[in-house]
Amino acid sequence: RNLRGSFVRVMNIRKEDTTMADVKKVIEIIDKIIADVDEQKLFLTELDNVIGDGDHGINLARGFDAVKTIEDTFESKDIGAILKAIGMKLVSTVGGASGPLYGTAFMKSGALLNGKTEMDMNDFIEMLQVSIDGIMKRGKAVKGEKTMLDAMIPAHDAIKASYEADGDAKKALDAGVKAAEEGIEYTKTIIATKGRASCL
């Protein structure tokens, strides 16, 4: 809910920006994610009650609460190290399949951005791609199986196509959010073939 507002607002990207985020901005984004997950945990759990275990929101919030406990170490780290630390914390604290999947996305992104104190749009696009690749491999999933990939893959493709077309970072992010929202709506029309939902 309110995906467009929360993501685009916290990024605050302008058309002419070449640097997308530095360490300080990454920490701000993580803070926003933590707050949004906490705010939406009951909604996420309600969704999970329908065809899942009914604990997704609570588990995810527990994981990001744990991330909050290590946040005081982030200012001394590079972006890659921050993302890797978050991934490891999520793997160790989020129950079920979600922890390894979210953790994999962060750890793959961390490996990609190892040593970097700034990232640009090309880094972000590649970060989305390695996250998708990691989740596909870890979850043995592909697009069209009613998973997070049905939002992530269209978002990546839309951002990449838009940014390559005219180099407008803000426009590209807007396109990515729109594609993700459309992907979320698409999942309502298909049958789950992964996870507990596939058994119902």
Task: Explain the meaning of each model-derived region.
Residues 1-19:
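Short, Lys/Arg-enriched N-terminal segments with co-localized hydrophobic residues
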